[in-house]
């Protein structure tokens, strides 16, 4: 694991919406010595949030200098690429059981849950992230991804 401070990064934009998008965009001079560390799928950390680089684009700026633009998604987006989930039926279950199933085999675990509603429903989602979004929709509350501790939490709104 290589750690480096990207002190020459600029135009840094972090978009983080509750129950929504979470991504990071920034630029760095192409000639920056740390530019070579920035490859697709590498992890980045900004404060306590962890992101995975999805695109690295090199373009000429208006001044003629080459600039590297980075787009990275929060680490939890990896859950969209989890192993395929099979159809599941839940009878009067709290959110914990379907969340545990959704996270099985992903390296993520269930964190604190303050939503105590019981629901009966059938899951037809194909990956962990879409299943977690469905769980949030069915049980209510706010879904939070703790990218540092690799946990998914759901809080009462």
Question: What are the roles of these predicted feature ranges?
Answer:
Residues 13, 27, 52, 71, ...:
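Generic structural detector for well-ordered beta-strands
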Residues 57-79, 112-157:
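Short beta-strand-centered interaction patches in the first periplasmic/extracellular domains
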Residues 21, 48, 147-149:
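Residue-level signal for tight coil/turn positions that link beta-strands
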Residues 1-37, 73-77, 141:
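Juxtamembrane "anchor/assembly" segments of surface/extracellular structural proteins
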Residues 29-114:
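Surface-exposed cap/loop segments at beta↔alpha junctions
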Residues 1-7, 42-47, 129-137:
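Short, solvent-exposed secondary-structure boundary motifs
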